[in-house]
């Protein structure tokens, strides 16, 4: 089990580094150059008093339509950090999802081979456990083989079907707690993404307040850009958080189903066939 935790920690660090490098590369080569080019474009047409004369133009000379470009929305550092955290969280969710898929494939295997009319006696528990003990260590540490061994060992030691069923229930509950603990870093990112967006909100409001003096003289471009930082950071953070939370809840649902199906597997194929005499 320690090797599993070490592998998860290594994957988490590697995923964070790769996410940061990938997002930074995209920002440096695509998003910020495109945003700078859009903001540098002169107004396509002068402000017109007619309603259908063309796009509204800010005092900085950039059409308002261009300010709604996705490249302009994503260009600031808060959005970059939010996207790095979101991609990292999705990598962690994907890793945990692959572990769930590996465990689910084991439900198709027949670890306890019982012929028609055969039962499992306490003295036979050790013999039925030997095929599981001969499995590779990684497979032995997965939920289904581990819970089967717990059931067989408890049945052989106590000669009680009820104690064996209780041991399986406790093992499944421990697995749920372990899976929940593994998602702590994903929950951290789900909290950190809106926090980063709030930092952008505060920065944008501060920038807008600094330009308030210019607005008194009729130049609202600075206030507009400051409020744009606020809205863009908030929008990016909220959308990223929604995506992360959606996949997080999908993963939790898959984990809960896995544990429930494993418990039903053991009850149907082992517990029901246990006999004390």
Which role fits each region the language model picked out?
Residues 19-37, 95-96, 196-216:
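Juxtamembrane "helix exit" motif at the C-terminal ends of alpha-helical transmembrane segments
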């Amino acid at each position: 089990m320690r090797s599993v935790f070490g592998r998860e920690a290594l994957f988490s660090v590697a995923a964070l580094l790769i996410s940061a490098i990938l997002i930074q590369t995209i920002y440096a080569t695509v998003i910020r150059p495109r945003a700078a080019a859009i903001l540098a474009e002169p107004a396509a047409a002068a402000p017109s008093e007619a309603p259908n004369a063309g796009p509204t133009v800010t005092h900085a000379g950039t059409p308002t339509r261009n300010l709604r470009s996705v490249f302009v929305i994503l260009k600031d550092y808060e959005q970059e950090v939010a996207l790095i955290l979101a991609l990292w969280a999705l990598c962690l969710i994907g890793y945990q999802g692959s572990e769930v898929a590996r465990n689910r494939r084991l439900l198709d295997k027949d670890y306890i081979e019982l012929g028609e009319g055969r039962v499992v006696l306490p003295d036979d528990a050790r013999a039925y456990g030997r095929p599981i003990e001969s499995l590779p260590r990684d497979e032995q540490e997965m939920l289904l083989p581990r819970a089967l061994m717990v059931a067989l060992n408890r049945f052989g030691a106590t000669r009680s079907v009820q104690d064996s069923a209780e041991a399986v229930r406790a093992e499944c509950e421990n697995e749920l707690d372990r899976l929940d603990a593994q998602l702590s870093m994903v929950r951290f990112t789900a909290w950190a993404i809106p926090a980063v967006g709030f930092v952008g909100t505060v920065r944008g409001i501060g920038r807008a307040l600094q330009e308030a003096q210019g607005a008194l003289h009729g130049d609202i471009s600075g206030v507009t850009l400051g409020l744009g930082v606020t809205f863009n950071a908030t929008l990016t953070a909220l959308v990223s958080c929604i995506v992360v939370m959606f996949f997080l809840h999908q993963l939790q649902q898959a984990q809960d189903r896995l544990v429930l199906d494993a418990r039903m597997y053991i009850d149907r194929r082992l517990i029901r066939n246990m006999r004390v005499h």
